[in-house]
Amino acid sequence: MLKLFLSTPRTLPNSRFLLLRRLQPLGLRYRSDASSLHLFTPTWRDHATNTIIKFVPQQVAYVVERMGRFSRILTPGVAFLAPIIDKIAYIHSLKERALEIPTQSAITLDNVSLGLDGVLYIQVYDPYKASYGVEDADYAISQLAQTTMRSEIGRLTLDHVLRERQSLNIHITDAINKAAESWGIRCLRHEIRDIRPPESVVMAMHQQVSAERQKRAEILESEGKRQAAINVAEGDKQAEILDSEGQKIKTINSALAEAQAIREKASATASGIAVLADSIKKQEHGLEAVSLYIAQQYITNFGKLAKASNSMIVPASTSDVSGMVAQALSIFKQVSKTTAPDKSTPKELHTDEK
């Protein structure tokens, strides 16, 4: 005949009290602290009573000993235990758990003392190793995380610790997994929660940040001035280029216009001379009229030059005006003789050809 193990509820809510009343007729013992206890803890030799029929919750493993030796592991569902000789020695939660790592001090590679704390996420994957491989798993994992964190911090400088927190977490997780493999515990991830450097270092970091911001502001200001100067220089350059292009075009157009005017003037002068020469040839006394015109122009222009105080004519005799006129007429006659066509030349050439 089975012995009923009844427990009197003390601080249970009404729902738990009703559940207790339902379990008592089955001869099962209900523990009020079963759902709130840290099931993944050291030894649980007095927290699971052999009630012959046992309902194992989901994601919970019961380690059963028979006569003091390991017998088996109960998986979720219903299980039957032999009275007296079977005993639930350990209870482990197979869920992921968060284990808080207390604050500790660590010294970086550049001799800066830091205050660190973190959170470690762990999970039992082998209840047998978790039961018999370590005495106090929580304490062992916490101490291992602290020593690993100090070791990893000692390899890095302060700047690397602040900048590479994610890689530091990965290194700590790998180191804990290697050490805790024989405990049946897996470290899923580690998170550094807070890094507290000394006050002097914090003040120096603030000054460095302020200096960096001031430096960036000055650099941006100088870059703005530089860009503005470049833009002004580029504008002046383009203006000079456009102005020179305009002056070039203006000079070319002016030269072309002047050349065209000279050509037109020369053409008009040549036409006038040709008409005048033709008229002189046709007139009976044309050469005498031209000689008279030259003499008049010579005397008139010489008189204008004589009035100018800053003009000098060398050689020239102002007392012998008639001689100068005669000289000018002599030159004209020689030029007219040289330019006059020789009508006998073609005949002589024709005779020579014969």
Curated annotation (Swiss-Prot):
GO cellular component terms attached to this protein's record: mitochondrial inner membrane; mitochondrion
Q: Which InterPro entries match?
A: Band7/mec-2_domain (IPR050710), Band_7 (IPR001107), Band_7/SPFH_dom_sf (IPR036013), STML2-like_C (IPR032435), Stomatin_HflK_fam (IPR001972)
Q: Which UniProt keywords apply?
A: Mitochondrion
Pfam families, per the entry: Band_7 (PF01145), Band_7_C (PF16200)
Q: Which CDD domains match?
A: SPFH_paraslipin
- One GO biological process term: mitochondrion organization
The compartments listed are: Mitochondrion
Q: Which family does it belong to?
A: Belongs to the band 7/mec-2 family.
The protein in question is named: Uncharacterized protein C16G5.07c
The species is Schizosaccharomyces pombe (strain 972 / ATCC 24843)
Phylogenetic placement of the source organism: Eukaryota, Fungi, Dikarya, Ascomycota, Taphrinomycotina
